[in-house]
A protein has these predicted regions:
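Short hydrophobic/aromatic-enriched beta-strand-loop microsegments
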Residues: 9-10, 164
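Class I S-adenosyl-L-methionine-dependent methyltransferase module
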Residues: 6, 12-137, 169-170
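Structural motif
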Residues: 159-161
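Short acidic, Gly/Ser-rich segments with clustered Asp/Glu that frequently serve as metal-coordination loops
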Residues: 154, 166-170
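Conserved acidic residues
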Residues: 148
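Conserved SAM-binding loop of SAM-dependent methyltransferases across substrates and taxa
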Residues: 1-5
């Protein structure tokens, strides 16, 4: 992207699509006020808390209760900002990709999400803070898809094709 090449990216997994949507397809402006607003939100008992935090009674310990709630608040806040027209699509994907990237730094895992640790490790105890991913300047004509490659391949073309199929059973 930074070298000016046109890039076409596809991933069937939504989290990866979101990251690529920002890193490959995006050059959005974000204000300090938007980040301050999201980081100042009070915790909400949402999806992450209910499914990945011990305090919810789900039996999992992937995030502290506080960080899970904070992640949920920011995720809900992003939807509100988008639906109210306060951020556009490029800003939405930038902030959502930054949330996905940020929350991983606070995960109570040994590095993969196959299992959580019994005790809360030191990095997972830190208070969650949304940190922005870098903006990679470059060509604005890149394409990012979230589709089955078997269908997409008939609608796109390029000079080089790199496929990275799933390689494990998880």
């Amino acid at each position: 992207k930074s070298k000016g090449y046109n890039i076409i990216s596809n991933d069937i997994q939504y989290y990866s699509y979101v990251l690529n949507k920002h890193l490959i397809g995006n050059n959005p402006p974000i204000t300090a006020e938007q980040i301050e607003y999201l980081n100042a939100l009070k915790g909400t008992e949402g999806f992450i808390y209910k499914n990945y935090c011990a305090g919810s009674g789900c039996g999992r310990n992937y995030f502290t209760d506080e960080n899970g709630k904070k992640c949920d608040s920011i995720r809900i806040g992003l939807e509100r900002l988008k639906n109210d027209g306060d951020i556009d699509e490029s800003q939405y994907y930038y902030l959502l990709a930054s949330l996905i990237n940020s929350i991983d730094k606070y995960a109570n895992t040994a590095s993969v999400y196959g299992a959580f640790l019994k005790g809360i490790k030191k990095s997972a105890q830190k208070e969650f803070k949304l940190e922005l991913l870098p903006i990679i300047d470059g060509n604005e004509h890149n394409e990012v898809y979230n589709e089955d490659i078997n269908h997409l391949i008939h609608r796109i073309n390029g000079d080089i094709l790199y496929l990275d199929p799933p390689y494990n059973a998880r």
